[in-house]
Amino acid sequence: EIAQCLVGSEMCIRDSCNVPWAILLDPTSACNLHCTGCWAAEYGHKLNLSLETIDDIVTQGKKLGTYMYIYTGGEPMVRKKDIITICERHPDCEFLSFTNGTLIDEEFCQEMLRVKNFVPAISLEGTEATTDGRRGDGVYQKVMHAMELLKSHGLPFGVSTCYTSANVDAVSSEEYFDHLIECGAYFAWFFHYMPVGNDAAAD
């Protein structure tokens, strides 16, 4: 594995170029939610990468020395079967997916345990009120259930938080981080709000 990682370093030196440590790709623009300010809502279910295209991207990336792949969306988890298939085909890679978490269930947890190279980063906007306010009623409780499932199986996962003028105080508080740790999260991504997409507000 160390030798594989060195491929990218050697290429950087030889060709005077930068090889990415990770490659981001959108498997689909489809999503089961309709969150405020999400660009994907503009595209609906129109944009999809085929399983073979995703597989080809990973195969090409490995030749460069890239072994980390990050799924964004849309909601990548609407492609659960394909996600697991890619994990099976590339056991030497690690796959992280940003997800709203509502499609994580017991069956998928068992698949994660089996393939061992998939990690979700679940979207959370802070409190139940701010999360449901942006993502829809009941989403916060579904996220909590997904985290409980993952934690109960000892599966690693993280959180993805978009900070806005409405939630910045809450998501930067010690209480929020304590809550994430208590839920079992291993890491957190923070993104600033961009007023694009569905009913986006500039303030």
What is each of the regions a protein language model found here?
Residues 17, 22-52:
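Canonical Radical SAM [4Fe-4S] cluster-binding loop centered on the CxxxCxxC motif
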Residues 1-8, 12:
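Single conserved hydrophobic/aromatic residue that forms the stacking wall/gate
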Residues 11, 31, 35-38, 122, ...:
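Hydrophobic packing within well-folded, soluble alpha/beta domains
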Residues 193-203:
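A C-terminal junction/extension of Radical SAM enzymes
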Residues 54-71, 79-192:
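Radical SAM/AdoMet-radical enzyme domain recognition
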Residues 5, 15-19, 63, 89:
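Short, flexible hinge/linker loops that cap or flank conserved catalytic cores
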Residues 48-51, 137-140, 203:
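Short, conserved loop/turn and helix-capping segments at secondary-structure boundaries
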